[in-house]
């Protein structure tokens, strides 16, 4: 399994300084004792030092805990990636969201085809005005009118999701679909997250760690 996966790019990342950091740690830790990585963030320093030292990675942020559990566990023996992918694809939550959002998915697919043909405006509108969260909340977030095609797709989704407009099952799709990810990608990310929270560690953290976040888009 690929282990060199970068899912977050920190401002001030220490990734390029790892050999120098290790030199100083070696100098200060001549007895080869345990190393505590305070404010470990994405865990790149802990992962690098783990080659030689016993590491205690510490951070107050929960996302950091997820990253480090995934990076520092050393992999999961016997994992069947194809089976996991199949289970995620067939997850009831994913099928439900594909049904709820099908009008929007059709329209987005049409816009992508237009983009390939050199017609940029429809896709540009999705990126600029395609916030389903803002549409459902009736927030005044756009300049000018929304096209009838996009509004019809949004209206169809609104009617389909009904009382599930705030469901955690589609949180990524509502907040980030269209703006950061395509709506299809966002639905898949929601499915991966839902599947991950059904798993035990370390698989849970590994799945969450490898899921894209808006800052990676």
Name each region found by the language model:
Residues 71-145, 162-164, 168, 175:
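Conserved phosphoryl-transfer catalytic core
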Residues 209-217:
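Single conserved hydrophobic/aromatic residue that forms the stacking wall/gate
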